[in-house]
Amino acid sequence: MLLRIEDIDAPRVVKDADRWIMDDLTWLGLDWDGDAVYQSQRLDAYEEALRRLRERGLVYPCFCSRADIRAASAPNEGDGFLIYPGTCRRLSAGERESRVIRGDRHSWRLVVPDGAPADALGCASSHVDDAAQAMHAALAVGLPRVVCFADRVFGPQRFDLPRQLGDVVVRRSDGLFAYQLAVSVDDMAMGVTQIVRGRDLLRSTAIQLYVRRCLGSADMPEFAHLPLIDAADGRRMAKRLNSLDLGAMREHGDDPRAVVGYCAWLLRLVGEPRPMTPQELLPLFSWDAVAADTADRVVDVDMLLR
């Protein structure tokens, strides 16, 4: 397991949050290989990646504000994600250059292909290895309009880039590198082979696979997206639930084994919550069990803290 501290958004970084994360992991009985990687120390790598994208003509300056984009776009698929309408993509090269020289505030966006969708990207296969091989073959012949991958939990995924994602920001107008570029560069540099995260990032996976291809990589990690955890009122878990903050639980004297066991139960790996260590959980783990129930989970605080 690799530990990466994603502190690239400097204005939002909380002092000592990295140490809290490490302390929480240690308390749960989890460790990681090697030193933690800090994104704030890898700005040169992101700058180099952006330079390569610019050399290939795959990015362009965008002068639109968030208000401009909201006014010109409709939310996609009811989830609030805005598809950039391509306003600045249609500007002439001369107009783009003159506005940059003039100092107009701008971000940098990555171009996604237009044209007929490419269908041979692995979506027809439900097998992870078959999908990966098809994806590699399709990426080898050029930049795809359609990105597909087989998820360990949610199965085959297919994203039409211009229709569902649009030209994504890789450097923000405030000069900070965007999450999608930074994590893609880091995953390649760190040799990440398996990524497990929430289902709300399925769309991000398609973006990141495309970013990787634009940077010359056809390798595809194995992905597993998990159901989200909701509070009892049906809303997503948030920091407002201080009682479930791991640091607060540790200070309160709660048993970390109870947390691990409860998570195992949420993932349908055990029939009922019971205290266990990560080492005791390992032989019980099964992706088939996790994938058998993809509904979001609701946390019962009383059950967890009893």
Q: At which residue positions do the language-model features occur?
A:
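A general structural signal for well-ordered secondary-structure junctions
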Residues: 31, 59-60, 78-82, 94, ...
